[in-house]
Amino acid sequence: MKNRIVLFLILLLIFSCDSNKNIPVDLKTEYSINPLGIDTDLPRFSWKLPQNSNVKRQLFYQVLVADKIINLKENKSLVWDSGKIKSDKNFTVFDGNELLPNTRYFWIVKIWDNNGNESSYSIHSSFQTGIKETWSAKWITDKEDINEKRAPYFKKEFKTHSTIKEATVYIASAGLHNFKLNGNNVGDEFMNPIYTRFDKRILYNTYDVTELIKKNNIIDIVLGNGWINHQSIAVWDFHKAHWRSRPRFIFEMVINYKDGRQEKIISDKSWKTSFGRIQFNSIYTAEHVDNNKENKSWKQVIEVPIPTDKISSQQLPPVRKVKAYPAVSFVKLSDNTYLYDFGQNMSGVTELKIDGPKGTIVRVKHGEQLKDGRLDNSGIEVHYRPKDDKDPFQTDIYTLNGNGQEIFSPIFNYKGFRYAEV
């Protein structure tokens, strides 16, 4: 009798282990892991079976969605229960109660296999809905026109009043934006948002800034021309685009406190604007930075009309810096000129660490090929139509302030290059 009990327990244990091997993994919403800014009312869910699974075929699945993890565990107050669905497909489309904007949801899934075995529920995944059509903020910019070459800087100070549960930022820009909160870069993306036709649609980015919020806070935003204001002229005629304007943006921070209160920090006339280090930026050519220029004479912003009626969440992989390549060699061309070889052609930017006397001007010219030992951009420069020599092609220009080591790297431009002539 004891042997039978032991055998029965062993069989139960084996069954339990097999069941645990079959728990779905790699849960994604709209093809992303725990995404923010989901705009669609019908998000798509997908999952996989683990590599060590003994399941040959999934026969059924069940998905649960809730706005609290505890509700998933207790199977109550669900936003959606798919029920037991007969299907061998590892994806489904949400079909539950209306999803609220700026709300985090959690979901789990379990499956039944071809042997009739039921898995345990997966570890929960999450997604957060976007702001949709509920913007309270205003579009703002400075008072300059499309001919102003200096980049506009913006700031806003605010205080929090209690313990924060979570804080989410939504920001859209006609042009490119670089966003800092309390001196910290927000997000690891580069040159956001992705290009669209600005008269048809503009994309907004979503950031979880909960960990960056303090009692006293300052928001810093600088805008780049991007595709909204082409000041460099080329054969593609983007400088003639009918949507051309001074860069502008809209910003909304939603702060949820643990005591249940909600507060919004929005872009409006209370923000201030100034000029700073970036003296010129062009997505075609380069960026010019003067470290002697500081943000002074902060002025009031102006509110401007919305550039388009359609503002959508950016739900595609952004541009990111993915790898650093040190120079593999360099040669001295003259007393003040050096040529660096990075070993392969790439789309990217250079980062320059340098110290020198105040007012020293450093030019970093990028290119893909050499001719007689010097950088040769003739193959691509034929498309460029400069008015003067102040905006040389693929050449960043930096002016030193003389205060020790300085670091330069463009934030609103990238190059195609293997070589850099400094």
Give the positions of each predicted feature.
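C-terminal motif of bacterial Sec signal peptides marking the signal peptidase cleavage site
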Residues: 15-16
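Extracellular/oxidizing-compartment recognition motifs
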Residues: 22-104, 108-422
